[in-house]
């Protein structure tokens, strides 16, 4: 199960229907405690905001981009941890990303999600890539384990915390980084208040047993 806890909008809304500049939307979501009503997700509203993609030529709206196949976690169920940067891992260069992003934008892509098998923040050019997306007014989001604190300005930033204490984190993630990730989340939340208030910061949990949800909270 994948449980996502959002402070403001969901990632899909950030990159699809709603703009972070919409003040009425922000007030509405704050009044709801930061959660969308369930029917909102099944009415087709997000798709209807892209009616040209339904009635016209079928084109992608968002693009997920893997910046690297290297990860600094060692999850026992994942293959990406076996790659090392100096022994077969690959990372997309800044120059190549720009080429691909411009081509995708020309096709009609409106938003980008920096994600992966690998951990996107490990890419040596990550901050340059993130800066370029922001400077060129692209809507973009990122999924990260947040072992590394980065001060960037996406529309949404989703952290895979996944555990509820040091022991459970190390069991799931293969590294002892639970407290470090928590501190990075706190530091980013404080930083974004002044520097990127429009960013929706969320946390997701990997649930093995229903009881884990109670422990997480």
Question: What positions do the PLM features span?
Answer:
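Short, electropositive alpha-helical surface patch
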Residues: 131-133, 208-217
């Amino acid at each position: 199960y994948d449980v996502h806890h959002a402070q403001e909008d969901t990632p899909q809304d950030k990159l699809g229907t709603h703009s972070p500049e919409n003040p009425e939307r922000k007030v509405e979501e704050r009044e709801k405690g930061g959660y969308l009503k369930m029917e909102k997700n099944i009415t087709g509203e997000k798709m209807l905001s892209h009616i040209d993609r339904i009635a016209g030529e079928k084109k992608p709206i968002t693009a997920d981009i893997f910046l690297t196949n290297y990860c600094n976690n060692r999850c026992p169920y994942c293959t990406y941890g076996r790659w090392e940067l100096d022994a077969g891992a690959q990372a997309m260069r800044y120059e190549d990303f720009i080429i691909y992003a411009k081509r995708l934008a020309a096709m009609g892509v409106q938003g980008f999600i920096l994600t992966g098998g690998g951990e996107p923040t490990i890419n040596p050019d990550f901050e340059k890539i993130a800066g370029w997306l922001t400077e060129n007014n692209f809507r973009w989001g990122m999924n990260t384990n947040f072992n590394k604190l980065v001060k960037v300005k996406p529309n949404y930033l989703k952290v895979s915390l996944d555990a509820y204490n040091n022991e459970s984190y190390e069991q799931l993630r293969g590294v002892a980084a639970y407290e470090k990730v928590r501190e990075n989340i706190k530091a980013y939340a404080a930083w974004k208040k002044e520097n990127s208030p429009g960013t929706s910061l969320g946390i997701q949990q990997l649930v093995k047993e229903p009881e884990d949800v109670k422990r997480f909270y």
